[in-house]
Amino acid sequence: MPLIQISEKQSRIETNRRRIKSAANRILNALGFTDAELSILIVDDEEMAGLNSTYRRKDTSTDVLSFPMREGEFGDVCEEVLGDVVICAPMAKRMGELHGASFQSVMDLLLVHGILHLVGHDHEQGRGEAARMADKTMELLKMLGHSAESFAWYVDGQD
């Protein structure tokens, strides 16, 4: 069973940690990472903008960031440790309002997106990889009980 830790550095938007943890567990199991370790951090815009600036040199907030532990020189030291997914709760709320989706469904979408990056998917590596990642995103969202069509706005913008 995956080991999942959830922390928050925001308090303005109520999140359901139990539901997030359950969704992460289901996603990891579906991807075959049954013994994985994952850290999820839920932040506000200010914290996310700081992380985005530090690690991506972009001076703005973003929806989700992933920090894989399985890359680089020491990536094979502890293969079950996947890394960290950082989700911006205010951004998720705004995205839901803009596209007529619930906050929780957008949180699930961003969680799927972040975990897929941790396990090697990268929509920025060309159209083929973007399409594979989009297909896997839709598959996992359906598994979580969402209508994949309701997220076309997000997936279409990833290539």
UniProtKB/Swiss-Prot annotation:
GO molecular function, one term: metalloendopeptidase activity
Keyword Cytoplasm: yes
Protein name, per record: Endoribonuclease YbeY
Cofactor: how bound: Binds 1 zinc ion.
GO process annotations (BP): rRNA processing
Domain of life according to the entry: Bacteria
Family in the record: Belongs to the endoribonuclease YbeY family.
Cofactors, names only: Zn(2+)
One GO location term (cellular component): cytoplasm
UniProt keyword terms in alphabetical order: Cytoplasm, Endonuclease, Hydrolase, Metal-binding, Nuclease, Ribosome biogenesis, rRNA processing, Zinc
Subcellular location: Cytoplasm
Enzyme Commission designation: 3.1.-.-
Matches recorded under SUPFAM superfamilies: Metalloproteases ('zincins'), catalytic domain
Top-level EC class as recorded in UniProt: hydrolase
